[in-house]
A protein has these predicted regions:
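Structured alpha-helical
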Residues: 12
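C-terminal motif of bacterial Sec signal peptides marking the signal peptidase cleavage site
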Residues: 15-18
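Bacterial N-terminal signal peptides that target proteins for export
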Residues: 1-8
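Cystatin/cathelin-like cysteine-protease inhibitor module
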Residues: 20-141
Length: 141
């Protein structure tokens, strides 16, 4: 019986020692993983066109389409490649809805998320250098 009580502190020390070890990746490892996903999206226009074909209610006859080349921008805890977009698309009834803006956020050179909330887009796209995007204006269903 006395030996059983002597073994309890030893077992308890092993259990507590297991709690003090770090189970997940370190902060530096997480940052390295995040940075490794920053690959320039060579096909950003094709990705945007494929996405907008389904995102827009009426992708035909878009006017005033402009896009910025992807640039590293602060998103969340680090930087991501972001391409900014301006366009005037039609609604289901064929009426133009007015100029809209969006930001395409890329992870590992692929479109990960499209931000369309004005406050977020304004923050992500401040200082973006836009150029004409005739491929979007020529888009069909």
């Amino acid at each position: 019986m006395r030996q059983a009580f002597a073994a309890v502190p030893l077992a308890l020390s092993f259990v507590l020692a297991g709690c003090s070890t770090e189970l997940g990746p370190s902060r530096a490892e997480l940052q390295a993983q995040w940075d490794a996903q920053n690959v320039y999206p060579q096909n950003y226009k094709a990705d945007l066109l494929a996405f907008l074909r389904t995102y827009l209610n009426n992708p035909q006859g878009v006017r005033g389409a402009m896009v910025s080349p992807p640039a590293l921008t602060t998103v969340g805890q680090g930087q991501r490649y972001v391409a900014c977009l301006r366009y005037n698309a039609r609604d289901i009834d064929g009426k133009y809805m007015g100029q809209k803006e969006g930001a395409a956020i890329y992870v590992s050179a692929r479109l990960d998320r499209f931000a369309d909330q004005p406050h977020e887009v304004k923050q992500l796209c401040s200082g973006a250098a836009y150029a004409a995007f005739p491929e979007l204006e020529a888009l069909r269903r």
